[in-house]
Amino acid sequence: MKITKIETIPIRLPTRRVHQWASLTTPIGVYVIIKLHTDQGLVGLGEAPVLKDWGGDYGKYYGETPQTTVHIINDILSPALKGQDPSRFESIHALMDKAVKGYPYCKAAIDTAMYDVVGKALNVPAYQLLGGLFRERIPIAHSLGLMEIDKAVAEALQAKAEGVKTIKLKGGVDQKRDVE
């Protein structure tokens, strides 16, 4: 099995609000979906969460926007991986690192798609390739950005009503406010 092409599809999911934390304000729900195509007609799916101020050394060098993600995958990583066997995970990691420094979300999307397509080729779920099922369900958390306290309380209560058991609070702008 060989990689024939990697397709990129930028998407934006609807969100309730802009997410703000101490280091940045950014839209959330922005992703690039990838489809890793093979010569056997199988397609593996992956996704890159796009955060322009994150990646690499705290986003200092490799913040990933939808545009940079599409460029890095289409113009650098896809040509470097064309013709490669997607089941050779470590080899592909080395090829990606040789092709471009950083861009961990781009590379993670390809990595996920490789596990997906190899699992499809072997007729097993991708988690079997990673050591087997660890848990039946995955608990989720809800992240509250920086916002007025009454809005944060209302959002936390709404998340709790929706079944969320873990609430993550953001702070770091004003210590007194953070304690309150």
Predicted regions and their residues:
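A general lysine-centric signal
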Residues: 35, 107, 168-170
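Structured beta-strand/loop patches that form or line metal/cofactor-binding pockets in enzymes
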Residues: 1-57
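Beta-strand segments within the central parallel beta-sheet cores of soluble alpha/beta enzyme folds
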Residues: 5, 92, 127-132, 170
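Glycine-rich, aromatic-flanked loop segments that form ligand/cofactor-binding clefts
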Residues: 105-106, 112-144
